[in-house]
C-alpha cells in the first residue's frame, strides 16, 4: 500500500510539473506574440 501511494504521489508530482511547464510555455509564447504585435506599432 505504501508503495502504491508513493507511486501515485510521484505520478501526481510529474503531472503537476508537466502542467507548470505547459503554462510557462504558453505564457512565453503569448509574450512573444505580444512583442511581435507591438513592434510594427512602435515603428509606425
Swiss-Prot record:
Highest taxon of source: Viruses
Keyword vocabulary terms for this entry: Host membrane, Membrane, Transmembrane, Transmembrane helix
A GO CC term attached to the entry: membrane
Membrane topology type: Single-pass membrane protein
InterPro entries associated with the record: NS7B_bCoV, ORF7b_SARS-CoV-like
Miscellaneous section: Bat coronavirus 279/2005 is highly similar to SARS-CoV (SARS-like).
Disulfide bonds: none
Protein's UniProt name: Non-structural protein 7b
Bilayer-spanning residue ranges: 9-29
Record organism: Bat coronavirus 279/2005 (BtCoV)
Species classification: Viruses, Riboviria, Orthornavirae, Pisuviricota, Pisoniviricetes
Annotated compartments: Host membrane
Amino acid at each position: 500500500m505504501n508503495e502504491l501511494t508513493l507511486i501515485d504521489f510521484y505520478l501526481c508530482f510529474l503531472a503537476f510539473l508537466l502542467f507548470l511547464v505547459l503554462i510557462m510555455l504558453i505564457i512565453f509564447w503569448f509574450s512573444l506574440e505580444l512583442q511581435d504585435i507591438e513592434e510594427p506599432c512602435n515603428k509606425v
